Amino acid sequence: EQMDAAGEIKKANSDAVRQCLNNAGAYLLFREKKEEGGAILKYALQLSDRDGININENITSSNTLGMMGSILLKEDQPVTCEGLYLQALEVFDKKKTMTRPELFDYSKACDGYSQLLVKWDKRERLGEQYQQKASELLMKMSENADWMFPLTSRFWTPTLFKWDFAY
């Protein structure tokens, strides 16, 4: 907010600033600080709005939406949570090519949505499909990498995944 007040956030660096906010929000969510993480993610979306960025077409904003969905998943607000995940997944689905960090974010959104779906009656199968997609995206991310899980330029949060998922 201090950078914003000082006029240091420009359209040219807006994506990078919003990604840093996403990283900070992800870290706070990992530390179970939902309110603080949510406030930071909300601010990232406010910056998008202020800069005239269409969040339905911007990959950084879709990452923010997916993380906000994870907050609502923890707060047991399934309907709003589903809307956020679907909105985020729609942006990822439209993108023809992705960088490894984008694949990782896409995988996180698929994983979060799968966790929501397996909690609902008669949607478990779809949840399993999204979990499979999340796993496939992680494997795609590691193609041509020197090791199984290459570092990304985004915040690495492997403990947010359910690695023991049986499929």
Which residues make up each language-model segment?
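"A position-specific structural signal for the A-helix of alpha-solenoid helical repeats
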Residues: 16, 22-23, 60, 66-67, ...
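Terminal, low-structured helical/coil segments at or just beyond the last alpha-helical repeat
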Residues: 112, 119-167
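Residue register of alpha-helical TPR repeats
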Residues: 12, 19, 60-63, 83, ...
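Residue at a conserved register position within TPR or TPR-like alpha-solenoid repeats
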Residues: 28, 65, 72, 110, ...
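TPR-repeat structural position
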Residues: 34, 78, 123-124
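Structural motif corresponding to the intra-repeat A-B loop/turn of tetratricopeptide repeats
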Residues: 31, 68, 75, 120-121
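Amphipathic alpha-helical segments of tetratricopeptide repeats
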Residues: 1-8, 42-53, 86-97, 135-139
